[in-house]
């Protein structure tokens, strides 16, 4: 069985990271959460009170405090800037509400895409994000475009936030997700869109295992 590159794209809270982690584990592939990288850059910008126009300052910060990944004792992904663990802070609502703006900065995307492509050269990989199949890994053997209704995605995010102890409101989440969809699909640099050769998968009404099995079946055809 050969190792392949699997690119999973889709809007916010469509279940990309959850299924990508499981698929990577099942196949023994590396998992890379590219969204966490943009969240890390956003966290750095907010922490240092940098606006979207202060690009040079943000790039300098990312050089001084490189984004890296690790694993906890239970196998969960950890995110670092420099040697500081920011795994939990990057999931706060303030970061979530600003990440689209930071991710739309061409120079930031260029820097992080280069890092993502470097990591992908190491063998079998599952990568999820907004532009993996179109920009980061256009040569990936399997591209998946994962979608779900705004209502379902808001419910998922609501349950995640409650489980993490993050104060949240369902109706507000629906508005935020719809607004983020618009920003992600209308930005000039690497907008969210389906790659021509991607498999379209609507996960509305499906549980995680059902989605995983559908993607694994597609992957096995290509191995």
UniProtKB/Swiss-Prot annotation:
It comes from Streptococcus pneumoniae (strain ATCC BAA-255 / R6). GO terms for molecular function: (d)CMP kinase activity; ATP binding; CMP kinase activity; dCMP kinase activity. InterPro entries: Cytidylate_kin (IPR003136), Cytidylate_kinase_dom (IPR011994), P-loop_NTPase (IPR027417). GO terms for biological process: nucleobase-containing small molecule interconversion; pyrimidine nucleotide metabolic process. It is found in: Cytoplasm. Belongs to the cytidylate kinase family. Type 1 subfamily. This is Cytidylate kinase. Gene3D superfamilies: P-loop containing nucleotide triphosphate hydrolases (3.40.50.300). The gene is cmk. Keywords: ATP-binding, Cytoplasm, Kinase, Nucleotide-binding, Transferase. Its main location: cytoplasm. It comes from the Bacteria. ATP binds at residues 10-18.
């Amino acid at each position: 069985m050969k190792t392949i590159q699997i690119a999973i794209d889709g809007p916010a809270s469509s279940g990309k990271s959850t299924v990508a982690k499981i698929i990577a584990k099942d196949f023994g592939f590396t998992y890379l959460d590219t969204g966490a990288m943009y969240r890390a850059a956003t966290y750095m910008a907010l922490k240092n009170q940098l606006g979207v126009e202060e690009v040079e300052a943000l790039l300098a910060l990312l050089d001084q405090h490189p984004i890296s990944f690790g694993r906890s004792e239970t196998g969960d992904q950890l995110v670092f800037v420099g040697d500081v663990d920011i795994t939990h802070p990057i999931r706060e609502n303030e970061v979530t509400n600003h990440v689209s703006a930071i991710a739309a900065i061409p120079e930031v995307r260029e820097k992080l895409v280069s890092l993502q492509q470097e990591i992908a050269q190491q063998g079998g990989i599952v990568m999820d994000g907004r532009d993996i199949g179109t920009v980061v890994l256009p040569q990936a053997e399997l591209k998946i475009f994962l979608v779900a209704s705004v209502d379902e995605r808001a419910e998922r995010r609501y349950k995640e936030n409650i489980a993490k102890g993050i104060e949240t409101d369902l109706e507000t989440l629906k508005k935020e997700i719809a607004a983020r969809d618009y920003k992600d699909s209308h930005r000039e640099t690497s907008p969210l869109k389906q790659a021509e050769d991607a498999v379209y998968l609507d996960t509305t009404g499906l549980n995680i295992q059902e989605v995983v099995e559908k993607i694994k079946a597609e992957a096995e055809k290509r191995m």
